[in-house]
Curated annotation (Swiss-Prot):
SUPFAM superfamilies: Thioesterase/thiol ester dehydrase-isomerase. It comes from Anaplasma marginale (strain Florida). HAMAP family: FabZ. Belongs to the thioester dehydratase family. FabZ subfamily. This is 3-hydroxyacyl-[acyl-carrier-protein] dehydratase FabZ. The lineage of its organism: Bacteria, Pseudomonadati, Pseudomonadota, Alphaproteobacteria, Rickettsiales. One of its GO terms (cellular component) is membrane. Its EC number is 4.2.1.59. The gene is fabZ.
Length: 147
């Protein structure tokens, strides 16, 4: 079953909050399989204060974090309807093959696509891509453990 999530549902499902909540909306999620999420990048983001003053660029590590949060939503949404899913933890274990293809700047909308490529027990591996429009901004494989 495909589902979408608004910001209120996302906030119930993720332990993150401002300024570290890096997913604004989920366009489509097949729980436990794949997700397409959005992060609207605005000039008001706190990291733009020092990264960089005259040339604001979203830090790559935060693009990776938005992919990790989207991936977490993919697996915790598998328990949609179970309000306890918000209490479920997913821990970042490793990242492989991280590549940054273009800068992300204020005004961009990141479209994050994450798919489960392997799940065994409580460990899950995701293939993640972040796009600005049709242009690939970043990609990585993320390994996480569900707690």
């Amino acid at each position: 079953m495909t589902m979408a999530l608004d910001h209120k549902q996302i906030m119930r499902m993720l332990p993150h909050s401002y300024p570290f909540l890096l997913v604004d909306r989920v366009l489509e999620c097949i729980p436990g399989k794949s997700i397409v999420a959005l992060k609207n990048v605005t000039f008001n983001e706190p990291f733009f204060v020092g990264h960089f003053r005259d040339n604001p660029v979203m830090p790559g590590v935060l693009i990776i974090e938005s992919m990790a949060q989207s991936s977490m939503l993919c697996v915790v949404s598998d328990r949609e309807g179970d309000e306890a899913s918000g209490n479920r933890s997913v821990y970042f274990m490793s990242i492989d093959g991280a590549k940054f293809r273009r800068v992300v700047v204020p005004g961009d909308t990141l479209t994050i696509k994450s798919a489960v490529i392997h799940m065994r027990g409580t460990t899950c591996k995701f293939q993640c891509h972040a796009y600005v429009g049709d242009e690939l901004a970043s990609e990585a494989q993320i390994l996480a453990m569900m707690g």
